[in-house]
């Protein structure tokens, strides 16, 4: 199942953090990883400002370039496919990477048709080694409850790429990895079956 309650909450909180927050400065705001998260969110706010006439597909089309620019989508796609990545053909790997980007763009984008913004506080930054850093933050959900959002970012030259987002300990990458594995298992181990299901989800 590709739209479980936990997944919807995860996408909502992560999406609010990326695309709908008003920045509240923290003590480590000058740190490079923090500045990167600020840059991503500032760009997203500009690009994803709600427009009443926009369709879900139009919002997804605006969001997709941001995912491709700021997220390490090739690595994320490979992780989400798990052990099936090695079993997939190069053509299937490329096709899955493309369609899962479309899927995430649609899943995030459709939640912000009328969203006006909530506060997010960026807190401490932790060096994980091997070029990886975790940026800890808290975002306010529409119901007023706070949610912890942790960003795992990977050094990429003179900038960073987002490798994963965790909401209250739930990993975006892990959640989809489990869902996709279930779909593949239910279709006789076929990666192409998952690809076709995702294509239908995004209308391709």
Locations of the language-model features?
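Sec/Tat signal peptide C-region and signal peptidase I cleavage site
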Residues: 23-29
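Surface-exposed, charged secondary-structure patches
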Residues: 106-147, 201-204
């Amino acid at each position: 199942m590709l739209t479980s309650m936990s997944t919807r909450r995860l996408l909502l909180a992560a999406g609010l953090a990326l695309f709908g927050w008003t920045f509240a400065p923290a003590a480590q705001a000058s740190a490079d990883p923090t500045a990167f998260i600020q840059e991503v969110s500032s760009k997203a706010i500009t690009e994803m400002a709600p427009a009443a006439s926009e369709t879900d597909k139009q919002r997804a089309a605006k969001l997709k370039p941001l995912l491709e620019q700021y997220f390490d989508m090739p690595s994320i796609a490979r992780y989400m496919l798990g052990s099936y990545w090695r079993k997939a053909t190069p053509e299937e790997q490329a096709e899955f990477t493309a369609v899962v980007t479309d899927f995430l763009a649609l899943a995030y984008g459709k939640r912000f048709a009328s969203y006006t913004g909530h506060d997010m506080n960026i807190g401490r930054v932790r060096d994980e080694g091997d070029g990886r850093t975790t940026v800890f933050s808290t975002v306010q959900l529409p119901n007023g409850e706070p949610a912890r959002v942790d960003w795992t970012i990977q050094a990429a030259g003179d900038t960073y790429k987002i490798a994963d987002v965790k909401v209250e300990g739930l990993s975006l990458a892990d959640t989809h990895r489990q869902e996709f594995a279930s779909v593949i298992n239910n279709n006789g181990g076929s990666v192409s079956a998952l690809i076709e299901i995702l294509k239908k989800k995004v209308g391709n």
